A protein has these predicted regions:
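A short C-terminal boundary segment appended to hydrolase-like catalytic domains
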Residues: 49-55, 65, 238, 313-412
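Active-site-proximal segments of metal-dependent phosphoesterases and phosphodiesterases across multiple
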Residues: 104-124, 240-273
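Binuclear metal-dependent hydrolase catalytic cores centered on His/Asp/Glu-rich metal-binding motifs
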Residues: 71-73, 77-81, 188-243, 262-264
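Conserved beta-sheet core of the metallophosphoesterase superfamily
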Residues: 127-130, 260-335
């Protein structure tokens, strides 16, 4: 019999228990000129701290977006400056790039996004290693935009490897729709002595164009059953320590509700061999669930949505509201979910620790959108500056996120 328990603490220790859209504006952006080199990150040669080889720490972010307001900043490095240490402390950090990267066109915002190479490079420099490229905005620039995205990500990968020796992984788009090639693109690599299999998919697209060039799985029952079978066979063909599936899910945006159909689908994927199901699309934070003592002795994890990591969706936060919990206010916060896993000698895998690290998109006095930790230290800073309305707002947002989302443990 399954038992589900709510865990109310920030850090979970399991070692012993074992009608809004994505838009705010619709315009072409003239990206500010930058005198800085392509990368800004300090000490990139030691991007991640090293851990015991039988232990791996993963950080899962949410959606990296770029609305017009996000481009108006002196340097993109500033976006990540106050959370970089948290990201680099993990062995691997994952994020979803929610836009094409077509260097032949100008940057653009909602409804047809196009992100710049430098914007994504800043996220890489901040410590992210693994990116999903498939979501409802992947084909915003049509087929050519997908092909240009692949070229841009290859350039980022090559530049980062040659300059700093760091391996970066992108998947979710395809160079050809030839049915003779593998149906979906994925990453299969080794990190810190762990073999990782990463497979991203999207269940929705904003237009039908070039869907064959994207890891697109329709959300109907037959397509999901076929994907479960595919995932099982993929793991069998690629022996790994961790199999992570990213899903840009066909569920309503801006709601914390989790449907039983959605939950069962993710549980079926765990049963088929996935160790982690990492879902996004809601643009707000949802619950997490740790599945303990599964039949094969492997602890597993579901993240239902980690919200926006960076965006311009919250342009007018309700600073003076006593309960700033509107849909737009919720889009301004995100989650870094930090998971520590341990390989046992008998081949089982245990989740030792899960830490929800809440973040928020802050609009500074220069009207720049930057990521800040959603914690008391940031509140104290705001009172000292002083930006009293912001301080009170962040206090309320901390309370809302702690009360509205939770970590669950399910024993099987």
């Amino acid at each position: 019999m399954k038992r589900l328990r709510y865990i109310g603490t920030i850090s979970i220790l399991l070692s012993t228990l074992l009608f809004f859209s994505c838009g705010t504006t619709s315009q072409i952006i003239n990206e500010p000129a930058e005198d800085q080199p392509l990368t800004q990150a300090p000490e990139p040669e030691s991007q991640h701290k090293k851990h015991d080889k039988d232990t791996i720490t993963l950080l899962f972010a949410g959606d990296i977006m770029a609305h017009s307001v996000n481009y108006y900043i002196t340097t993109y490095e500033k976006i990540w400056r106050d959370v970089r240490e948290v990201i680099t402390d993990a062995d691997l950090a994952f994020a979803n790039i929610e836009a094409p990267l077509d260097r032949t066109k100008a940057a653009s915002s909602y409804p047809n996004f196009n992100m710049t190479q430098k914007y994504v490079q800043a996220a890489v420099d901040a410590g992210f290693d693994v990116f999903s490229l498939c979501n409802n905005h992947t084909n915003d620039q049509y087929k050519n935009g997908i092909l240009e995205t692949i070229k841009t990500t290859q350039a980022i990968t090559q530049y980062t490897k040659e300059s700093f020796g760091n391996d970066i992984y992108f998947s979710g788009t395809k160079e050809t729709a030839d049915s003779k090639l593998p149906a979906l693109t994925y990453n299969y690599f080794e990190a810190n002595g762990w073999k990782i299999l990463f497979l991203p998919i999207t269940e929705l697209l904003n237009r039908p164009d070039a869907s064959d060039y994207i890891n697109f799985i329709k959300p109907d029952s037959d397509s999901r059953k076929a994907f479960i079978k595919y995932a099982k066979e993929l793991r069998q063909a690629n022996p790994c320590d961790l199999f992570i599936i990213s899903i840009h899910t066909s569920e309503p945006e801006y709601t914390r509700n989790i449907t039983e159909r959605q939950n069962q689908y993710y549980m079926d994927l765990l049963e088929a061999g996935a160790d982690v199901v990492w879902a996004n699309h809601a643009h707000i934070i949802k619950d997490r669930k740790i599945v303990v003592n599964t039949k094969n002795g492997r602890d597993k994890l579901i993240m239902y949505a980690n919200g926006n990591t960076i965006s311009g969706q919250r342009t007018k936060p309700e600073l003076t509201s006593k309960n700033p919990a509107s849909e737009r206010d919720n889009t301004g916060d995100g989650l870094f979910y930090i998971v520590t896993m341990h390989r046992e000698k008998d081949g089982s895998m245990k989740i030792k620790k899960c830490e929800p690290y809440f973040i928020t998109t802050y609009i500074n006095t220069a009207n720049e959108y930057v990521i800040k930790p959603l914690n008391q230290d940031f509140v104290d800073y705001l009172y000292d500056v002083p930006r009293t309305n912001w301080a009170k707002y962040i206090e309320r947002r901390i309370k809302i996120n702690k009360e509205a989302t939770k970590d669950l443990i399910e024993w099987q």
